[in-house]
């Protein structure tokens, strides 16, 4: 029921968060948009939001009013996608082939997967031609070897239904691993705990899950 966003100004490796916020209670009474700018300005108001397209339109309208001449000024849009199955081990530019693979992974993430897809579809409709990139929570964990990701169940469940250990919160674990390596001066071995809306623990060796 929520879409979160951040607006970045990016130039030659430098980036700054101009604004961030969310549209909450999508499809429910009392839906609202909340925005916090980098200068401390905060904005919140109720607005009727029936679906993810309405939410993204509300975000683009607000950003166009406060930070952009128009939404077409955006150079690219990044999407956090929940599941990339075994297709993706890194972020990718979204095209028809990528979308087909994302649709194919929906049975692996039936609760949240459709919402991620709706976001891409809405942005494609509202900003046709703007580059879109998908980052997958499961991508970081594609380095896990088969003995570690295989469950002790009949092999056909993996071969036919793709039931295996995938790993999640990969973008968070990857970032934490990089920062830990910077602090300790080496990659090494780490146990990384992600504690947020969900929780997960990952063993990381030499920067890999």
Language model regions located:
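Short beta-strand-loop/turn "lid" adjacent to the catalytic site in phosphate-handling enzymes
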Residues: 63-112, 131-133, 140-148
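Conserved active-site "lid/cap" helical segment
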Residues: 29-75, 105, 119
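Conserved active-site and cofactor/substrate-binding residues in soluble primary-metabolism enzymes
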Residues: 50-54, 93, 97, 114-118, ...
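A gly/proline- and charged-residue-enriched helix-loop-helix capping module
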Residues: 101-119, 123-126, 160-163, 167-174
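Non-transmembrane, aqueous-exposed alpha-helical and coiled segments at domain scale
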Residues: 71, 118-119, 127-129, 200
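Glycine-rich phosphate-binding loop of actin/hexokinase-like ATP-binding domains
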Residues: 140-209
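Short glycine-rich, Thr/Ser-proximal phosphate-binding strand/loop in the N-terminal lobe
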Residues: 2-49
